Amino acid sequence: MAKIMIDAGHYGNRYNAGVISGYYESNMTWELQGYLKKELEEYGFEVGTTRAAKAEDLEVSQRGLRSLGYDLFISLHSNAASAEAPDYVALFHLVKDDTTKADEVSKMLAKKLAPVIAKTMGTVQEPKVLDRPVDFDRDGD
């Protein structure tokens, strides 16, 4: 069975969306991580998390390195909004200098997940699947 690493976005009480008083992205992603981990484990997946404690502050590169040996890395976030209702879902997949099969699979997975998440959240607009250019020195430059 596949191994999945979940990253609960930010840490502590960080990133208030501004629209809803008392809402912090870090709290939401930490709670969602717990639900998602439990659900995936019930389906038989081996699931790890990048942080053992909500207040643990790790650099992005450290969180990414903790996913070595896993088949899928999911980083949870919720962007600020200008209204109380969710506007749209955005899923990002990585695009590297030397695209591999894994990059294409991540894009396909994002395209399949986006409409399901949007329907569940009841968003106003269609979901967006976006490229996130990254060069973690896979090509050696």
Predicted regions span which residues?
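Short glycine-rich His-centered loop
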Residues: A2-G22
